[in-house]
């Protein structure tokens, strides 16, 4: 393998969970032909978050090696609703919602990608031209048994949970997108494996060379458990104010911090290993987390904004003398929420709800450094954060439904 190709593969596959097949990728890169690299995004909400950027960063790497990136906005597929990882049928979006959200995607993606090397496409370009007969012919290429090999469909079927017929079309449509684009490479998360391989199958049937599939790991959300998702409200949006982004990044656990370095930072592996060694030798993990926060904010805002966000964080949090060893608690608040007094009691910050109410009345309760005064407030998942009662009682409370 030529040195140039080996170097390209090392950069392209860095952090990837799986590559199918690496030898195919090497042959395509060795050809010297600019490759068509595809990644699809369904506009299910109007803002990109850091979880999306794991893929987009990888697309940028391909661009830096001279290849063409197709950022495919699944406006047609978005009206189906991706069933991946869901145990219920996802409600499809309206045409108006899809169009509005897609426009926002277009505005945001160039914060990372080079506009001159990016082709923005919508899969409605070809899918909306398909008639009933064409769609039936496409559906006939696969069997129900094959579709039930997909984990989420299999689980729902075994649990007697409904699966709508249109959900079976989603992998086929995503696969057909690869045929229409003549994709050489497709990127996707590990949860998209079934759909990505469908593209290879359909391309073979159409006489095309099957796309190489590169699967990137899923980025965990702020809770450190479930994947970052707008619908789970555990995400950091790339257009959020710099101060908000800084605070959210600083709130992640030390363990999750290293995961974010691996998948979001452009620092070399050597640099990250040096930071790990420094922490092992006694360096405060919070100082390292600041480096991560500033790098990400500089990317999506500016270096000046990153500096200002750090100063704002210092004023709001560090001057309030937050301890380094804040215990982490998980409190289940239910779909309708839980009263703030009960949350404080469940987290062990007070002995009773009456004490909680008394402390709130005395302005002795803070959430993320801000005084809390509403004793009737119902806490929901979005209210996770650092809770303080008095001067010495702290807890990082993760609220779950």
Swiss-Prot record:
The gene is tyrS. It is an enzyme of class 6 (ligase). Residues 338-399 form the S4 RNA-binding domain. Catalyzes the attachment of tyrosine to tRNA(Tyr) in a two-step reaction: tyrosine is first activated by ATP to form Tyr-AMP and then transferred to the acceptor end of tRNA(Tyr). One of its GO terms (cellular component) is cytosol. GO terms for biological process: tyrosyl-tRNA aminoacylation. A motif ('KMSKS' region) lies at residues 227-231. This is Tyrosine--tRNA ligase. PROSITE patterns: AA_TRNA_LIGASE_I, S4. SUPFAM superfamilies: Alpha-L RNA-binding motif, Nucleotidylyl transferase. Its main location: cytoplasm. Pfam families: S4 (PF01479), tRNA-synt_1b (PF00579). Belongs to the class-I aminoacyl-tRNA synthetase family. TyrS type 2 subfamily. HAMAP family: Tyr_tRNA_synth_type2.
């Amino acid at each position: 393998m030529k040195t140039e190709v080996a170097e390209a593969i090392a950069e392209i596959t860095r952090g990837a969970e799986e590559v199918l097949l690496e030898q195919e990728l090497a042959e395509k890169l060795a050809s010297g032909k600019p490759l068509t690299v595809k990644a699809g995004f369904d506009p299910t909400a109007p803002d990109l978050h850091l979880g999306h950027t794991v893929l987009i960063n990888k697309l940028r790497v391909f661009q830096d090696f001279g290849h063409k990136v197709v950022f495919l906005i699944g406006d047609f597929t978005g009206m189906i609703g991706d069933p991946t990882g869901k145990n219920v049928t996802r409600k499809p979006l309206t045409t108006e919602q899809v169009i509005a959200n897609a426009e926002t995607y277009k505005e945001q993606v160039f914060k990372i990608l080079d506009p001159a090397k990016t082709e923005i496409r919508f899969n409605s370009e070809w899918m909306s031209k398909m008639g009933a007969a064409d769609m039936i012919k496409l559906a006939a290429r696969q069997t129900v048994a094959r579709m039930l090999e997909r984990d989420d469909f299999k689980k729902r079927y075994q649990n007697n949970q409904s699966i709508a017929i249109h959900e079976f079309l989603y992998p086929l449509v995503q696969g057909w997108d690869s045929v229409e684009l003549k994709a050489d490479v497709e990127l996707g998360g590990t949860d998209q494996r079934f759909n990505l391989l469908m593209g290879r199958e359909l391309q073979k049937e159409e006489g095309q060379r099957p796309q190489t599939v590169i699967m990137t790991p899923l980025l965990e959300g702020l809770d450190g458990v479930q994947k970052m998702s707008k619908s789970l409200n555990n995400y950091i949006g790339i257009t959020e104010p710099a101060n908000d982004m800084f605070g959210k990044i600083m709130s992640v656990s030390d363990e999750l911090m290293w995961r974010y370095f691996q998948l979001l930072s452009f620092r070399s592996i050597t640099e990250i290993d040096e930071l790990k060694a420094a922490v092992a030798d006694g360096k405060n993990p919070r100082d390292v987390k600041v480096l991560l926060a500033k790098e990400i904010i500089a990317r999506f805002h500016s270096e000046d904004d990153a500096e200002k966000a750090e100063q704002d964080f210092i004023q709001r949090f560090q001057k309030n003398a937050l301890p380094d060893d804040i215990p982490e608690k998980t409190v289940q608040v239910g779909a309708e929420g839980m009263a703030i007094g009960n949350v404080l009691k469940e987290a062990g910050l007070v002995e009773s709800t009456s004490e909680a109410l008394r402390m709130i009345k005395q302005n002795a309760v803070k959430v993320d450094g801000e005084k809390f005064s509403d004793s009737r407030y119902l806490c929901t998942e979005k209210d996770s954060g650092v809770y303080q009662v008095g001067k010495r009682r702290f807890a990082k409370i993760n609220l779950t439904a």
